[in-house]
């Protein structure tokens, strides 16, 4: 089983950090189904240091479970990232993950995210400063490299390991690929062979077969599920069960899904308040219903609603109609 410092994961399947997706309520839901680890959405270190309202909300954690208390930080200033890491440690975080993989223009434009893979000296300073600043484990998530000519993830993983970083996750694409093409799980094997710390494979892991193939091709210690979990908070635990037993556990029934969607919707409203929560919930409701009969009409109707009670009534009506078909 994977250990990050003294923290042992219950499975080798992890929920990826995803901006505007893996907030506290979604992480709690995925963890309850049985994820080995859940990671917060990316938080800008400088915003964290000045205690912006949004950053403080993003770093909220479940305090009684170390595997629900992993916070991901982004930035390019070693001292600022280190300070943000210490702040999160003081607030109860048990693991800090460093973002070296985000391909978004607004992130790399500030020389953060995957742009850090172009400057190994700066990367080393960030690793060293953050490891030194806290007592909790530091992990890092990266891509294969910036482009096809600079696939330096194995070298960067070595630098991370020598600096005291305790786990590396690799998305099997370069920054310049964004999300086009297919994740190169074979390449991740070169990272696994370069270091002794746990290596996690990420990218395109959306079902049982792909999870098994990603592990076999990469030789990684575990896998990280990202976009495949949209509208399927149970997928991470399903994959973990499959990898352990070979059994393909079915998704929750439609009746069970109604309960899950309703619970998640209520949790979002409680956490954010109705005025903010209703718009946030729409994307999740859309993903939950995707592929079900008449889901396009349902999503269109929900997207026009602002009354929380009306939305909840529409959710119940839709899932009840699906159960009758």
Swiss-Prot record:
Catalytic activity of the protein: a 5,6-dihydrouridine in tRNA + NAD(+) = a uridine in tRNA + NADH + H(+); a 5,6-dihydrouridine in tRNA + NADP(+) = a uridine in tRNA + NADPH + H(+)
Active site, per annotation: 102 (proton donor)
tRNA-binding keyword on record: yes
GO molecular function: flavin adenine dinucleotide binding; tRNA binding; tRNA dihydrouridine synthase activity
Broad class of enzyme this protein falls into: oxidoreductase
Enzyme Commission number(s) from the entry: 1.3.1.-
Named cofactor requirement(s): FMN
Chain positions recorded as FMN binding sites: 17-19, 72, 141, 202-204, 226-227
Pfam families for this protein: Dus
Keyword RNA-binding: yes
Keywords: Flavoprotein, FMN, NADP, Oxidoreductase, RNA-binding, tRNA processing, tRNA-binding
Family: Belongs to the Dus family.
PANTHER family: TRNA-DIHYDROURIDINE(47) SYNTHASE [NAD(P)(+)]-LIKE
Function of the molecule: Catalyzes the synthesis of 5,6-dihydrouridine (D), a modified base found in the D-loop of most tRNAs, via the reduction of the C5-C6 double bond in target uridines.
UniProt name for this protein: Probable tRNA-dihydrouridine synthase
Organism: Rickettsia felis (strain ATCC VR-1525 / URRWXCal2) (Rickettsia azadi)
Gene symbol of the encoding locus: dus
């Amino acid at each position: 089983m994977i250990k990050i410092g003294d923290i042992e994961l219950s499975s080798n399947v992890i929920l990826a950090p995803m901006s505007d997706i893996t907030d506290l309520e979604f992480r709690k839901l995925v963890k309850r189904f049985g994820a080995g680890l859940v990671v917060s959405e990316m938080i800008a270190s400088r915003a964290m240091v000045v205690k912006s309202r949004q950053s403080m909300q993003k770093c909220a954690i479940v305090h009684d479970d170390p595997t629900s208390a992993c916070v991901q930080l982004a930035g390019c200033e070693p001292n600022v990232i280190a300070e943000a890491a210490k702040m999160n440690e003081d607030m109860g975080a048990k693991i800090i993950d460093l973002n070296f993989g985000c391909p978004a223009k607004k992130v790399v434009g500030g020389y953060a995210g995957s742009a850090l893979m172009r400057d190994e000296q700066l990367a080393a300073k960030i690793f060293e400063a953050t490891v030194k600043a806290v007592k909790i484990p530091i992990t890092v998530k990266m891509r294969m490299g910036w482009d096809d000519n600079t696939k330096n993830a194995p070298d960067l993983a070595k630098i991370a390991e020598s600096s005291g970083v305790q786990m590396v996750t690799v998305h099997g694409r370069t920054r310049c690929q964004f999300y086009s093409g297919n994740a190169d799980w074979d390449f991740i094997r070169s990272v696994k062979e370069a270091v002794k710390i746990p290596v996690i494979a990420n990218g395109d892991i959306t079902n049982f077969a792909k999870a098994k193939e990603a592990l076999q091709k990469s030789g990684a210690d575990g896998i990280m599920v990202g976009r495949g979990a949209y509208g399927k908070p149970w997928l991470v635990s399903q994959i973990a069960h499959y990898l352990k037993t070979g059994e393909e556990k079915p998704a929750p029934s439609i009746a069970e899904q109604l309960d899950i969607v309703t619970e998640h919707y209520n949790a979002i409203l409680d956490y954010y308040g109705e005025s903010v929560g209703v718009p946030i919930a729409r994307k999740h409701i859309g993903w939950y219903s995707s592929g079900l009969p008449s889901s396009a009409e349902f999503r269109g109707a929900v997207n026009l609603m602002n009354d929380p009670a009306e939305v909840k009534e529409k959710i119940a009506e839709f899932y009840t109609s699906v159960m009758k078909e």
